[in-house]
């Protein structure tokens, strides 16, 4: 697929695309697995980035010969939060920050009249914390979170939901994603997908994307 001649809308994932939060989330998940007696590594937990955990959590447990469901993991996570072992929302951590160039790209897109949206698997209560802390909320015309859709990435529903709300055609929509599941979701929705590799810590396989973006300073769509 070639890049759209006219771009009406750009839809962004959040974690690892707007906010460099994935390393923080992975470290938190190491603690949770440890509470369950599973010696998961930081690298193991990075495989959970961009996904809802229904397949990745059992896979991590299986690696160490332990059966575990996503429901059991999230119950243990709640116990860790209640015990003060981990912060409930990664966006509150001092080391959390936006990726370099994020605010500038969003301002340029909006100045050019391009609609912008945030499409994330993360639940809305957490996303709102990040948007508020980093002053991102006013920069989006649409926000779709994990608790707003029945099916998550790699299913196309999250991106289709955003495009339906904004009344835009996928042929004129660009998606920015940093995970294999997110890339597949954007492609399945019929969009042109940029595979973002701008995080210094986490670089997932985005080779299936239509184009790879290494930095927002190279972002030339607007």
Where are these regions (language model features)?
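Active-site neighborhood of HAD-like aspartate-dependent phosphohydrolases
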Residues: 2-47
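Asp-based, Mg2+/Mn2+-dependent phosphohydrolase catalytic module
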Residues: 1-10, 103-110, 114, 123-222
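Helix N-cap/coil-helix junction residues
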Residues: 38-40, 66, 136, 167-168
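Alpha-helical substrate-recognition element adjacent to the catalytic core
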Residues: 35-65
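Conserved G/P- and acidic residue-centered "switch" motifs that form tight phosphate/ATP-binding loops
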Residues: 13, 17, 120, 178
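Metal-dependent phosphoesterase signature
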Residues: 39, 61-107, 112
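An amphipathic alpha-helix signature
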Residues: 26, 30, 53-58, 124, ...
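Short beta->alpha linker loops
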Residues: 24, 48, 52, 97-101, ...
């Amino acid at each position: 697929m070639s890049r759209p001649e006219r771009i009406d809308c750009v839809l962004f994932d959040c974690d690892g695309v707007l906010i460099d939060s994935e390393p923080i989330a992975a470290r938190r998940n190491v603690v949770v697995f440890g509470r369950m007696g599973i010696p998961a590594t930081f690298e193991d937990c990075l495989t959970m980035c961009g996904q809802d955990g229904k397949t990745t959590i059992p896979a991590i447990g299986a690696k160490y010969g332990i059966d575990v469901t996503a429901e059991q993991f999230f119950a243990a996570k709640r116990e860790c939060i209640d015990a003060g072992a981990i912060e409930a929302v990664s966006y509150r951590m001092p080391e959390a920050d936006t990726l370099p160039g994020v605010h500038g790209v969003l301002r340029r897109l909006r100045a050019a009249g391009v609609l912008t949206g945030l499409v994330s698997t993360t639940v809305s209560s957490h996303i709102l914390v990040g948007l508020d802390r980093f002053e991102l909320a006013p920069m989006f015309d649409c926000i779709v979170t994990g608790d707003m859709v029945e099916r998550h990435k790699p299913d196309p529903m999250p991106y289709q939901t955003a495009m339906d709300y904004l009344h835009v055609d996928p042929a004129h929509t660009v998606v920015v994603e940093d995970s294999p599941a997110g890339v597949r979701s954007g492609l399945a929705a019929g969009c042109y997908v940029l595979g973002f590799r701008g995080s210094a810590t986490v670089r997932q396989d985005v080779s299936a994307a239509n184009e790879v973006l290494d930095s927002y300073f190279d972002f030339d769509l607007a």
